[in-house]
């Protein structure tokens, strides 16, 4: 028998007494990634929500937080950060496909909500820092760690002006 997910919450008392309740769940969710970054394996995802009764449904309002890592899009060094995404979703029985989440047998499962929020918030092109200089496109040196002697490529559209400058220098 599979172990019970910590993201499964019994909401019978919330529905019966119509009293809101705060839930904080910290657990691992495997395979959270997009093309540019991921939640490191073994890392905890924090789901902090207020569960509010709405008749026979439950509204979850709060945040989802998780660490992330991925290669910097400019220098390829590993970049790290923490994402935080807002959530405001409804759980009901029967659920409306794509609109609400299922509430079944007086239980809700926060994992699909957390998974969707994290995947939407993960950076697709991470930066190690805002002012990252990146790699030199000619020699490949990391310009955050040193400089190179490569000259920037000349724009061919300005070549006529370069010729004028050369002509002026020769005449003097």
Language-model features, listed with the residues they occupy:
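Structured interface patches
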Residues: 1-172
